[in-house]
Design a protein with these regions (language model features):
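Terminal targeting signals and extreme-terminal segments of soluble enzymes
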Residues: 1-146
Length: 146
């Protein structure tokens, strides 16, 4: 993974919809790429075909789906942070709905509610046919970067 940019630079890239820079910073696995950002929303795509991401039964490993979910929720919260705000995950729950076969996966992260101290973010991961394969809810602690 690349050396992280200063947080303000990463937040600026998210706000400016700089998909290449955000993918470089937050795309922790080859094949993951940012597709779209809007206030409170992030969309990513992942070509989950590398042998290491597939379990012995032929499905994408849950841990890798969790990493993909992390990119979705990280960038969704990043779209809503004001200058000087930071956020960290307080809790994350992932429910695996349907086994994910290797191939293209789509993901969407969305802010449910953001206050001055707590934010609630959700993500959905679907296969190329549009079937839901994982649902994620997360709670974030929001703080000032003092």
């Amino acid at each position: 993974m690349a050396t992280p940019a200063p947080l303000s630079a990463l937040n600026r890239a998210i706000r400016e919809n700089d998909l290449v820079e955000v993918t470089r910073q937050l795309g922790p696995e080859p094949g993951m790429r940012a597709v779209e950002f809007a206030p409170g929303l992030s969309r990513w795509q992942w070509e989950a075909t590398a042998a290491r991401v597939v379990n012995p039964f032929g499905f994408v490993r849950g841990g890798y789906l969790s990493v993909f979910a992390g990119a979705l929720i990280d960038s969704a919260i990043g779209t809503a942070l004001a200058e000087g705000e930071l956020a960290t995950t307080a809790e994350m729950k992932i429910s695996y709905i349907k086994p994910a076969k290797p191939g293209v996966l789509q993901g969407e992260g969305r802010i449910v509610q953001k206050g001055s101290r707590v934010a609630f973010v959700e993500a959905r991961i679907s296969n190329a046919q549009g079937d839901l394969v994982a649902s994620v809810t997360s709670t974030w602690t929001v703080m000032r970067a003092d």
